[in-house]
Amino acid sequence: MGLDQIQTKTNLCSKAVSTLSGLSSLWKLLLVGALGLGSAMTQTAAAVDADFTIGNKLADMLRASRSVVSANQGLINDPDIGDKQFSSEKFVQAADAIYLKRVGTTLNLSELSERDRRLLDAQRRAMRLVVDDHQAEINRIGVGFKGFIPAIFARLTNEEFGAIAAQEARIRVTAPPDLVRNRKARPDPWEKNILETRFLTSGWPKGKAFTEEVEFEGRLAFRMLLPEYYRESCLACHGTPKGELDITSYPKEGGIVGDLAGAISIVIFR
């Protein structure tokens, strides 16, 4: 073999090594990129899971606190009792008891993340503020119906929560347009779409929440809508006969147990 042939083969080998080295670098870049993408996806999934968990806790506590108001309507509306001992502290204790009974665990704030503690603490503060603000009305002698019903309590509590935690989260109760009594509860386009295309369809699993990451007020947010259905205790105001005036002088909706009554809407900003 001549020197020229040897040199040619040497050059070819060098090019092959260089090519392999380039491919190796490319694969390294692809691998790093894949690992980075996988890490980002894992972090996103973890964030969604965390938001879903705190969303459920907030919704469950709202439901528990509404149940306390519902269960105490007889006491609240008793015109013969002055100081009803319906303090905000006792109220929160009763809500915690119902939460435990329904969920199976207590709300141990010390075991939660800093953000989740802030949100749940904000909700509890809001509950206390609303009950404290209505003490004079609740304890008014000579007046029967006070108007302090579950729906009013929930709306006021959610508004107080929004004032406290506005930069981190929002909660409100909404419903299909034909069931909305208060204009403030009208569904926004996103909520209306989910109510009509998911919750009101026969194929949607009863009780299943809908979640989505979307833009809300110019910020990326985790949105969660949890369906609510009429219970027996709801029918005094929302049952039959449809059109009959309830205790608030509003026409009943004609609902029956199990019908979709509305939804709890939760926004958690990223």
Can you say where each PLM-predicted feature lies in the sequence?
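Contiguous N-terminal and early-domain "leader" segments and peripheral loops that mark the onset or edge
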Residues: 13-16, 32-34, 46
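Intrinsic structural disorder/low-complexity segments
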Residues: 8-10, 46, 241
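Extended, compositionally biased low-complexity polar/Lys-Gly-rich tracts
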Residues: 26-27, 150
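The canonical Cys-X-X-Cys-His
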Residues: 230-242
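N-terminal secretory signal peptides that target proteins for export/translocation
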Residues: 1-23
